[in-house]
């Protein structure tokens, strides 16, 4: 029994870490939904919810939830008139989005193109829209 004690402790710790990760994902999903719901009525609130999701995954790379939150954060900042902040976050979101998630990558590039169009940099807007 004593020989199995370290194994039991390890299994308990692994189980706890899995539960914590699952809770984080569920919290992120809830906050992203709140961000989407508030986007056009209250962009400042949408920005807040999206920023909370980004904080949930501080060091992770290749995380679609974080990239999606950054996308909605950028949309909210665009609506608030903060175009530079929006573009910077969209380029950062491209780093987090998995390359196989074509829909998310397409949405990010389309929003970058729309922002460059708003800033009257039409060549850059076309370049981003073609990706």
Predicted segments, located by residue:
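Positively charged n-region of N-terminal signal peptides that target proteins for export
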Residues: 1-6
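Residues marking helix boundaries in flexible regions
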Residues: 8-10, 127
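Hydrophobic h-region of N-terminal signal peptides that target proteins for export
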Residues: 11-19
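A "functional boundary" signal
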Residues: 18-131
């Amino acid at each position: 029994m004593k020989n199995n004690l370290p194994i039991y402790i390890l299994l308990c710790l692994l189980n706890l870490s899995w539960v914590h990760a699952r809770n984080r994902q569920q919290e992120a999903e809830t906050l992203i939904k709140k961000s989407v719901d508030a986007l056009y009525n209250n962009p400042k609130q949408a920005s807040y919810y999206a920023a909370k999701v980004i904080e949930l995954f501080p060091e992770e790379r290749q995380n679609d939830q974080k990239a999606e939150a950054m996308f909605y954060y950028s949309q909210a900042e665009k609506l608030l008139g903060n175009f530079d902040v929006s573009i910077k976050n969209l380029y950062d979101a491209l780093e987090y989005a998995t390359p196989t998630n074509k829909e998310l990558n397409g949405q990010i590039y389309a929003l970058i193109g729309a922002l460059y169009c708003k800033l009257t940099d039409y060549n850059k807007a076309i370049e981003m829209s073609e990706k």
